[in-house]
Design a protein with these regions (language model features):
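Short glycine-centered segments of the SAM/dcSAM-binding site in methyltransferase folds
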Residues: 47, 138-140
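A short acidic, Gly/Pro-enriched loop at the edge of an enzyme's catalytic core
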Residues: 100-111
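Class I SAM-dependent methyltransferase SAM/SAH-binding core
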Residues: 49-51, 55-101
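A short SAM/SAH-binding and catalytic strip from SAM-dependent methyltransferases
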Residues: 111-123
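A short glycine-rich, Lys/Arg-flanked "PGG" loop and its adjoining helix->strand segment in the class I
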Residues: 125-137
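C-terminal alpha-helical "lid/dimerization" subdomain adjacent to the S-adenosyl-L-methionine
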Residues: 4-8, 25, 142-201
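Conserved class I S-adenosyl-L-methionine
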Residues: 1-42, 57-61, 80-83, 156, ...
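C-terminal lobe and adjacent flexible extensions of AdoMet/dcAdoMet transferase-like proteins
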Residues: 204-211
Length: 211
């Protein structure tokens, strides 16, 4: 797949760190996985899509703790997907793609989850609409990311803007809620929490209700 801007910078940055990503961010990955999984309304035989699956850490954990769940991942970085393919069972399908243009037909998934990906998305409304498109009616989006309500996250974002050109922006809870509603989600809920002194996160949930 030909990489489209602005994901060229994301691909370049994560291709460079893919081999050490899991080690470098081990605490953050573990903490965000636990918080996200705790908020996933998983049912028997649900089909789940992980958008921005990276090296497959969340999919690997879900395959362990919820084995009946049918799992699919998508990510724009081939180097990260290569690592994911080595660690994941062969029945977990992995695809190259980006949030604004998912390579799936309509209404394919019961759950769409995205963990620590949204701050890279240049067109957030397009991405939210696209994730809703692949949800079946009644399906849910569960999105975990940095939260701009926290001062330390806002300061860290300023630092990231100086050193990481792939970074787009983080959002406050009211911005996230507004975008979810504008994108057609119902029953929008957002929880905020901290995993340490630096990282303040939010997990947003919205339901795809058929018009």
């Amino acid at each position: 797949m030909q990489t489209q801007a602005p994901y060229q910078e994301v691909v370049a940055e994560y291709a460079r760190i893919a081999g050490r990503y899991d080690r470098k961010w081990s605490f953050y990955i573990e903490a965000t996985m636990q918080e996200t999984i705790a908020r996933l309304p998983l049912g028997e035989e649900d089909r789940l899509l992980d958008v921005g699956c990276g090296t497959g850490a969340l999919l690997y954990r879900l395959a362990t703790v919820h084995p009946p769940t049918r799992l699919v991942g998508v990510d724009p970085v081939p180097a990260m997907l290569k690592i994911a393919r080595r660690k994941l069972p062969s029945d977990i399908a992995l695809h190259e793609g980006w949030a604004e243009q998912l390579p799936f037909a309509d209404a394919q998934f019961d759950l769409v989850v995205s963990c620590s990906m949204f701050h890279y998305v240049a067109r957030p409304l397009d991405a939210l609409i696209e994730m809703r498109r692949v949800l079946r009616p009644g399906g849910q989006l569960v999105l975990t990311d940095w939260c701009g309500d926290y001062l330390m996250c806002r300061l860290f974002e300023r630092y990231q803007r100086l050193r990481a050109h792939a970074h787009a922006r983080i959002y406050r809870t009211h911005d996230c809620a507004r975008m979810l509603k504008e994108s057609g989600y119902a029953a929008v809920q957002i929880e905020t929490y901290k995993i340490n002194w630096l990282w303040g996160l939010m997990t947003a949930r919205g339901t795809h209700v058929q018009a």
